[in-house]
């Protein structure tokens, strides 16, 4: 399971800046759930082959309602969710009484904690860091989150005890397809798991949130190995029973990150709600293959079914690559068809394609519809090669690639999806500007070449063509 890191500290010490710095890597996922987390923001980030989840909390001052009540809120939950705590302090302000109160609470929770002295630019580190050693929490790490200084060395220290994840293990090839069942509470996730397994392996109650933690279940179907990951559902903040569902968002993000295929279960009777869309976005940004299951479909009348289908067509255009199934997990209607989409999505996400094949597709696409002209010059796309899988990444080389407009990127995505017959997985197309290897050679001439060129120009002037 990937580690969870909470950023804790007083207001305005740079927690959000550090959060943005950590989650701005190429594969970062930033998930700010409106109305769900309020003062907590969740993001997935990566340092080389180490993935981790970051939680940004609201500031703790301890001056208005007291540190105890403040810590009992969002930051306390973040600390409970976390494996590691980054305690952010302000180097310019120095040690503050609120810092000492926060440190006292962190010691009570006995979590692995790193003191991070932010805003160190322009200061003598020895003088600036000295007061924070009085907290008695070990080494103090100097950083300037705004410019990224010291952040990489900090994270290398923090993640040193967490081994890198080999590519093969990330893809789950040894254990078969890993399927994450995600969705809001009480949409029927555990019922669907039991239906897929053919037995009551997961306790099911009517009360939302009875699946407290993610459950990993290994099984085989027709001699093929699978792992089902059942998660606690995501629910609006005001409805969360803290004793039951305080870990739901982190567990859902961890399950998505750990899965090969995500089945998003939605309640057909409620239609499409904002949290469903956020979960779809989370899966897509994580690059996971996606299957959508609308549960409780058999309980709808025809007019309601017609309305829901129209809503799906209108609001889910951004996931038009995902297969949609109308099911009843309770009665088993349509559940068996999910496996075909799971297999298809996994195959599409993990297929390998040759450079020659990808380049031919690119050339055909360019012949059919050329890129636009920028500043009087046509964008040239020369060749393509694979850049990874799960999800498929295609690297396109050419000139002026920074100017390729979004609509042309969409055109290339659709072309590759159609020709490669990819279903259920997002595609990522990245561009590289290729330098002309002969350009420097054209610009520079030897002395002898220069003399010969001048003589030729002089002859041409003296002997003009008639």
From Swiss-Prot:
Basic and acidic residues bias spans: 455-466
- Molecular function per GO: GTP binding; ribosome binding
Q: Give the EngA-type G domain ranges.
A: 3-166, 177-350
Q: Which PROSITE patterns match?
A: G_ENGA (PS51712)
Under InterPro entries, the record lists: G_ENGA (IPR031166), GTP-bd (IPR006073), GTPase_Der (IPR016484), KH_dom-like (IPR032859), KH_dom-like_a/b (IPR015946), P-loop_NTPase (IPR027417), Small_GTP-bd (IPR005225)
Which amino acid positions bind GTP 2, per UniProt?
Answer: 183-190, 230-234, 295-298
For the biological process aspect of GO, one term held by this record is:
ribosome biogenesis
Q: Where is this region: Disordered?
A: 442-466
Q: Where does GTP 1 bind?
A: 9-16, 56-60, 118-121
Keywords assigned by UniProt, alphabetized: GTP-binding, Nucleotide-binding, Repeat, Ribosome biogenesis
What Pfam families does UniProt report for this protein, alphabetically?
A: KH_dom-like, MMR_HSR1
Family statement drawn from the similarity comment of this UniProt entry: Belongs to the TRAFAC class TrmE-Era-EngA-EngB-Septin-like GTPase superfamily. EngA (Der) GTPase family.
Q: Matching HAMAP family, A to Z?
A: GTPase_Der
The protein's assembly and partners: Associates with the 50S ribosomal subunit.
**In UniProt terms, what function does this protein have?**
GTPase that plays an essential role in the late steps of ribosome biogenesis.
Protein name per its UniProtKB record:
GTPase Der
């Amino acid at each position: 399971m990937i580690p969870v890191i909470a950023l804790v500290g007083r207001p305005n010490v740079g927690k959000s800046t550090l959060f943005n710095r950590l989650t701005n890597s190429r594969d970062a996922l930033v998930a700010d759930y409106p109305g769900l987390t309020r003062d907590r923001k969740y993001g997935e980030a990566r340092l080389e082959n180490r993935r981790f989840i970051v939680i940004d909390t609201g500031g703790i001052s301890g001056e208005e309602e007291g540190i105890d009540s403040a810590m009992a809120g969002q930051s306390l939950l973040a600390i409970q969710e976390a494996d590691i705590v980054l305690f952010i302090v302000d180097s310019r302000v120095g040690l503050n009484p609120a810092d000492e109160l926060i440190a006292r609470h962190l010691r009570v929770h006995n979590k692995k904690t790193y003191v991070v002295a932010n805003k160190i630019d322009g200061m003598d580190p020895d003088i600036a860091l000295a007061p924070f050693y009085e907290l008695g929490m070990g080494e103090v790490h100097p950083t300037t989150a705004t410019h990224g200084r010291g952040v990489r060395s900090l994270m290398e220290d923090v993640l040193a005890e967490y081994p890198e994840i080999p590519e093969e293990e990330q893809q789950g090839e040894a254990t078969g397809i890993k399927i994450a069942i995600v969705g809001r509470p009480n949409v029927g996730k555990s019922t669907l798991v039991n239906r897929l397994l053919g037995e009551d392996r997961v306790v099911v109650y009517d009360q939302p949130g009875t699946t407290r933690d993610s459950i990993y279940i290994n099984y085989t179907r027709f001699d093929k190995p699978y792992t089902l990951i059942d998660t606690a559902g995501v629910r609006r903040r005001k409805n969360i029973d803290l004793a039951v569902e305080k870990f739901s968002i982190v567990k859902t993000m961890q399950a998505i990150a750990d899965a090969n295929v995500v089945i998003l279960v939605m309640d057909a009777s409620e239609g499409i709600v904002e949290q469903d869309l956020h979960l779809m976005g989370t899966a897509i940004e994580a690059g996971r293959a996606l299957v959508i299951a609308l549960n409780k479909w058999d309980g709808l009348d025809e007019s309601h079914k017609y309305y829901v289908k129209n809503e799906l067509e209108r609001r889910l255009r951004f996931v038009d690559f995902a297969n949609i199934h109308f099911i009843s997990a309770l009665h088993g209607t349509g559940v068996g068809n999910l496996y075909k989409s799971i297999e298809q999505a996994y195959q599409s996400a993990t297929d390998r394609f040759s450079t020659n094949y990808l380049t031919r597709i690119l050339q055909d696409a360019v012949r059919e519809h050329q890129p636009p002209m920028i500043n009087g010059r046509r964008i040239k796309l020369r060749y393509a090669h694979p850049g990874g899988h799960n999800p498929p990444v295609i690297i396109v080389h050419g000139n002026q690639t920074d100017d390729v407009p979004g609509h042309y990127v969409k055109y290339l995505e659709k072309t590759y999806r159609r020709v490669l017959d990819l279903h259920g997985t997002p595609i990522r197309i990245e561009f590289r500007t290729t330098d002309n290897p002969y350009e420097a050679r054209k610009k520079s001439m030897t002395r002898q070449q220069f003399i010969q060129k001048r003589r030729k120009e002089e002859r041409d002037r003296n002997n003009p063509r008639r």
